[in-house]
Amino acid sequence: MNATIRRGSVHDAEAVAGLHALSWRTAYVGIVPEQALGDGLSEERRALWELRLAAEYGEPANTPELLIAEQAGSAVGFAYLVPQADGRILLDNLHVEPGRTGGGIGRALLGAARSHVARQHPGADLYLEVLCDNTRAVAFYEREGGLRTAEQEGFFPGGFVLPEYEYTWTAADRDQSTS
């Protein structure tokens, strides 16, 4: 893998937005409506990440965390963790640059996310939502020990509603695997 995982900052907004749009345009073809992946996607993702990373979030325990995977000084993947009101931590994004998938970067980011949650939010479950038809991601999360805990409708930018699964890594399972 040879990637370094580090904390992200507002200075990563452009790189993260570019990775996010590129990942969607690769992984979501045939899954989401074409217009959701069109010309405005890059600018929409850039605005989203500039807002997310520049915002004042308040208490440290409630602050989202951006993790960046780098190779040769360039961002090649990222994960974004968001504490939720119910005490769980949402892994809101986990993306790896297309062409680098399958090389351990996603596994390293997920591992770093789980470690961050264990350190900063002891006792909290980590969960994510993934489009049901994103079979490559679904298979990855199942290989990585995620438990399918829900099937629901997900709201995608542009007003699209698509079926998604929720996968959870419980604090209890994490604690057993580290003891």
Protein language model features and the residues they cover:
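Acetyl-CoA-dependent GNAT
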Residues: 3, 7-11, 17-99, 107-121, ...
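C-terminal "cap" of GNAT-fold acetyltransferases
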Residues: 88, 123-138, 143-179
